[in-house]
Amino acid sequence: MIDKEYQRIMTERTASAPRAKKSLGQNFLQDKNISAKIVAALQIGPADCVIEIGPGPGALTDFIQKAAPASLWLLEKDTYWAGEHRRSDSRTPVEKQVVLTDALTFPWERLSDDRSWKLIGNLPYNVASPLMWDCLSLAAFSRAVFMIQKEVGDRIVAAPRSRQYGALSVWLQSHTVPRKELIVPPTVFKPRPKVDSAVLSFAPLPLSARNFSPGALSVLLKICFQQRRKQLQKILKRYWSDAVCGWFEQQGLPPAARPEELSPNQFQQLANLLESQLVS
């Protein structure tokens, strides 16, 4: 149920603003309870450094500031909303930085692991997949919570041999433990999207559990899932060898297996094997 006072505040903030930009995938959340649940799922502590992607009118930002993290970075591509957040700096005790940038080009790999980084955002549908592919594999973060299109969320948590299982499933499950937190209907946004959204949390896997070459895995996934209905032996015919054949036998997989039949761990092993062949 939408909180009328909260909706009034959000409406006031957007009344004098330019219209939501379709090119930026802007759909502004209007529900106080859902905003609170999304931020609560991030489990913010006093030592955390929070990065919010695309804060817009601040539906999540207000709750993040109330949670009192050590610092808050706002990554905003829209010049209007970046300016609004800069003007509001003096109204909060939380150390806040507003960065006018495209999160797709942000240097996630430069986040130092000596700080507790937490990532959050209502991600635009049109960039959510490539953005999560990068930031959840490159950034040294301790937790992330994103609201995305429900269909994309279903793909992320999908299991092998399911219709939704694909490259994004394997990649993110190789770097994180994703969990679906809640489903959000279109009615709580302005303008309304045409589909449901899902809120997912991500806990990073320890480095000891990521014993694979990210570059090799990324290439392998893109090759395999571009031809997901073909047999792996045919997809990988350029790289097929006695060692690869032996690996399939060891895993109990026939050469006729298709990409969706391999688990994330099996893709990691296969990527390492293929890379070792190429460099030997």
Curated annotation (Swiss-Prot):
<keyword id="KW-0949">S-adenosyl-L-methionine</keyword>
<keyword id="KW-0694">RNA-binding</keyword>
<dbReference type="Pfam" id="PF00398">
    <property type="entry name" value="RrnaAD"/>
</dbReference>
<feature type="binding site">
    <location>
        <position position="76"/>
    </location>
    <ligand>
        <name>S-adenosyl-L-methionine</name>
    </ligand>
</feature>
<dbReference type="InterPro" id="IPR001737">
    <property type="entry name" value="KsgA/Erm"/>
</dbReference>
<keyword id="KW-0963">Cytoplasm</keyword>
<comment type="similarity">
    <text>Belongs to the class I-like SAM-binding methyltransferase superfamily. rRNA adenine N(6)-methyltransferase family. RsmA subfamily.</text>
</comment>
<dbReference type="GO" id="GO:0003723">
    <property type="term" value="F:RNA binding"/>
</dbReference>
<keyword id="KW-0489">Methyltransferase</keyword>
<dbReference type="InterPro" id="IPR020596">
    <property type="entry name" value="rRNA_Ade_Mease_Trfase_CS"/>
</dbReference>
<feature type="binding site">
    <location>
        <position position="122"/>
    </location>
    <ligand>
        <name>S-adenosyl-L-methionine</name>
    </ligand>
</feature>
<keyword id="KW-0698">rRNA processing</keyword>
<dbReference type="InterPro" id="IPR020598">
    <property type="entry name" value="rRNA_Ade_methylase_Trfase_N"/>
</dbReference>
<dbReference type="GO" id="GO:0052908">
    <property type="term" value="F:16S rRNA (adenine(1518)-N(6)/adenine(1519)-N(6))-dimethyltransferase activity"/>
</dbReference>
<dbReference type="InterPro" id="IPR011530">
    <property type="entry name" value="rRNA_adenine_dimethylase"/>
</dbReference>
<keyword id="KW-0808">Transferase</keyword>
<feature type="binding site">
    <location>
        <position position="54"/>
    </location>
    <ligand>
        <name>S-adenosyl-L-methionine</name>
    </ligand>
</feature>
<comment type="function">
    <text>Specifically dimethylates two adjacent adenosines (A1518 and A1519) in the loop of a conserved hairpin near the 3'-end of 16S rRNA in the 30S particle. May play a critical role in biogenesis of 30S subunits.</text>
</comment>
<protein>
    <recommendedName>
        <fullName>Ribosomal RNA small subunit methyltransferase A</fullName>
        <ecNumber>2.1.1.182</ecNumber>
    </recommendedName>
</protein>
<feature type="binding site">
    <location>
        <position position="29"/>
    </location>
    <ligand>
        <name>S-adenosyl-L-methionine</name>
    </ligand>
</feature>
<dbReference type="GO" id="GO:0005829">
    <property type="term" value="C:cytosol"/>
</dbReference>
<dbReference type="InterPro" id="IPR023165">
    <property type="entry name" value="rRNA_Ade_diMease-like_C"/>
</dbReference>
<feature type="binding site">
    <location>
        <position position="102"/>
    </location>
    <ligand>
        <name>S-adenosyl-L-methionine</name>
    </ligand>
</feature>
<dbReference type="InterPro" id="IPR029063">
    <property type="entry name" value="SAM-dependent_MTases_sf"/>
</dbReference>
<feature type="binding site">
    <location>
        <position position="27"/>
    </location>
    <ligand>
        <name>S-adenosyl-L-methionine</name>
    </ligand>
</feature>
